[in-house]
Amino acid sequence: MASTCLHYGQQSFEGLKAFRGKDGKVRIFRPEENAARMQHTSRGILMPELPTERFLEALDMVLRLNKDFIPPYESGASLYIRPLMIGLGKQVGVSPASEYMFLMFVTPVGAYFKSGFRPSPMAIMRGYDRAAPLGTGQYKVGGNYVASLRSGVLAHEMGYSAVIYLDAKEKLYIDECGPANFFGIRGKSY
């Protein structure tokens, strides 16, 4: 119960998907990049860095043990993979943990956009920030996502599919569009 992941948010995570191709082969997009981002987060929140080789070994193992749960190509679904590192240890007080646990779990998931790829209305909500400047916004930690729960629910209640977050300092520039990429086009330039 007395662990830094529960009390102070010392945890990091990644998210990958395994897709079965038409040829039956399983594919994952750039897992080395996820390993590198997890290492960046670990440095930022004072957790040990998991070597890329260990990350990839764990990924291979979790896929091998769960190969029967990777949906068929025709389904459009995938196997979601969640690598996670948490700070443990018996301590209360804001400081790095004395122990850490790395784990990976998987779950089959359907297509992210249930109605396919099409334009979707999104809300700009100036009263909310997804991440604070000079804080943990550059790291993949849960605290950055819990901050978006209220604005996300409000956007859905107003009929929008998601929130476009503006920069926290000036509220002038697009900072993030959670579930998708954002492209702005004016005339013939973007």
Regions found by a protein language model. Name each.
Residues 72-86:
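Extended, Lys/Arg-enriched charged tracts that mediate electrostatic binding to polyanionic substrates
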Residues 1-62, 84, 91-190:
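Helix-start/capping segments and mature chain N-termini
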